[in-house]
Design a protein with these regions (language model features):
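A charged, aromatic-enriched C-terminal amphipathic alpha-helix characteristic of glycosyltransferases
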Residues: 307-311, 321-359
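Membrane-proximal helix-turn-helix segments that form the acceptor-binding/catalytic region
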Residues: 79-83, 99, 106-107, 115, ...
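Donor nucleotide-sugar binding/catalytic pocket of nucleotide-sugar-dependent glycosyltransferases
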Residues: 137-178
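N-terminal subdomain of nucleotide-sugar transferases
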Residues: 1-43, 85, 149, 203-208, ...
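Nucleotide-sugar-dependent
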Residues: 196, 238-277, 287-295
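Conserved donor-binding/catalytic core segment of Leloir-type glycosyltransferases
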Residues: 178-196, 201-207, 212-213
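An aromatic- and histidine-rich active-site surface loop
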Residues: 13-15, 70-77, 89-109, 117
Length: 366
C-alpha cells in the first residue's frame, strides 16, 4: 500500500488534504504547532484520532533558534509513527517541517517531498523583525527549491517560484451539515493581533447584545479581554473541529477583518483559513479585501467584503443576520463548485507523486 505522511502545522484544513490523499494511499497526519496532534486516514476515513496535546515550547525560543528543535521533533515523530518504514511522499508546511522531510529523503526514508507554503511575510517593521523575516524567507526559498514540488495556498506567494514544479494548492471546504436554524451568535477564530480589529467587534456585539465566541488566544487578546461584552465566551486554543463545529452551528456570522489591507500586509499573500472553517459550518463571513481568496468570497455572495471601519462592519453583520438563508445558500453553491477543483488537483498531483516513475506532469500553474 502506498503511504503518504503529512508534517504540518494547524489551520489550513490539513485534515481535508489528508482525507483526499488517503483515497490514493494510507495517510499519516502530524500536526505540530501550539497543539500537537496525530491522525491516520485510509480510503477517506479517519482510522486513528490521537489526543490534542498543548505544547509548551516558547514561541520566542522557537523564533530565536529558527525552529531547530521542531525539525528534530518532526523527524522523531516520523520514525515513531511509521516504525522507521519508508513512505512514498511527505507533504510538509513551513520550512521546519520541510527541512525534516528533506533529511528523511536524503537518508532514504521517503521518495518525494512536497513543500507547502502557506504565507509570505514581507521584510517590513523593526530592524530585528526585518532581519528575522529575511532569514526565515531564505530558509523557505531554500527548502522549496530542494523539494520535488512546491505548492502555495495563494497565487500571490512568490516563494514557490524558485521550484520549476510549483502549483497553487486549493484548500478543501468541508461540509459539516450544520443546521440553518438557531443562528443567534457570532464566531471568531484566530490568534488576535491589533491588525485583526477584534476590539471593533467587541463594541458592535455590546451595542446589539450579540453573543460572541472566540477561538484562539494571544498576549494581545489577554490585554483587551476586559473590553469584551460580559456574555463573550473565550474557548481558548483548540484543534478539535467537532467542538468548534458545535459552537459555530449557533453562529449566523463569522469575523475575519484586517486593518491592514495594503499589498505589504501578510494577509495579502496568504489565505484566510478561518473562512474555510466558518464555511464548513455554513457561517457567512465579514472580511476585508486582503487575500486573493477574498475575491471568491465577494463574487460568490458567501459573505460581505468591507472596509475596516465600524460602520461598514456593523452594517454587514446586521445584513447577514437579516438574510442568513441567502448567504447560507451561497456557501453551499461555492462549496460545490470550489471543491470540484480541489479534488481534481489532489487526484492529479498526488497520483503523479505516488507513481514509481512519474508520468509527465501538467504544466505548473503560476
Amino acid at each position: 500500500m502506498k503511504q503518504v505522511v503529512m508534517l504540518t502545522g494547524i489551520g489550513n484544513n490539513d485534515r481535508g488534504t489528508a482525507r483526499l490523499a488517503s483515497e490514493l494511499g494510507r495517510t499519516i497526519l502530524v500536526q505540530d504547532g501550539p497543539i500537537a496532534h496525530e491522525e491516520v486516514w485510509e480510503n477517506g476515513v479517519r482510522t486513528y484520532d490521537g489526543p490534542e496535546i498543548h505544547t509548551h515550547e516558547s514561541r520566542l525560543i522557537a523564533e530565536a533558534t529558527f525552529g531547530f528543535m521542531g525539525i528534530i521533533r518532526n523527524i522523531r515523530t516520523y520514525y515513531r509513527l511509521t516504525r522507521g518504514e519508508k513512505s512514498d511522499v511527505i507533504l510538509t508546511s513551513a520550512y521546519v517541517q520541510t527541512a525534516a522531510g528533506l533529511w528523511l529523503r536524503a537518508i532514504g526514508k521517503t521518495r518525494k517531498v512536497v513543500c507547502i507554503v502557506s504565507d509570505y511575510l514581507p521584510p517590513t517593521g523593526s530592524l530585528s523583525l526585518r532581519i528575522h523575516r529575511r532569514i526565515t524567507g531564505f530558509f523557505t526559498r531554500l527548502v522549496a527549491r530542494l523539494s520535488d514540488e512546491a505548492w502555495a495556498v495563494s497565487p500571490r506567494i512568490p516563494t514557490v517560484k524558485v521550484n520549476p514544479h510549483h502549483f497553487v494548492l486549493p484548500l478543501l471546504i468541508d461540509d459539516n451539515h450544520a443546521p440553518v436554524t438557531g443562528r443567534e451568535e457570532i464566531g471568531y477564530i484566530g490568534f488576535p493581533s491589533p491588525d485583526h480589529a477584534i476590539d471593533l467587534l467587541f463594541e458592535i456585539c455590546r451595542k446589539h447584545g450579540l453573543k460572541l465566541n472566540v477561538f484562539g488566544d494571544s498576549a494581545y487578546l489577554q490585554s483587551i479581554k476586559h473590553l469584551a461584552p460580559p456574555n463573550t465566551v473565550f474557548h481558548g486554543i483548540t484543534n478539535d473541529t467537532s467542538k468548534i463545529g458545535q459552537v459555530l452551528a449557533r453562529c449566523f456570522c463569522g469575523y475575519a477583518v484586517y486593518r491592514d489591507t495594503s499589498p505589504n500586509s501578510y494577509s495579502h499573500f496568504g489565505v484566510p483559513s478561518k473562512c474555510l472553517q466558518l464555511f464548513a459550518n455554513n457561517v457567512p463571513v465579514v472580511t476585508t479585501n486582503t487575500a486573493h481568496f477574498t475575491q471568491t468570497i465577494a463574487s460568490s455572495g458567501a459573505g460581505c467584503v468591507v472596509e475596516p471601519v465600524p460602520e461598514q462592519i456593523e452594517r454587514a453583520i446586521l445584513d447577514i443576520r437579516a438574510r442568513y438563508p441567502v448567504y447560507s445558500d451561497a456557501i453551499n453553491r461555492l462549496r460545490d463548485s470550489w471543491n470540484a477543483g480541489v479534488r481534481q488537483f489532489h487526484r492529479e498531483r498526488i497520483s503523479a507523486l505516488l507513481e514509481a516513475t512519474p508520468a509527465p506532469a501538467a504544466q505548473p500553474r503560476s
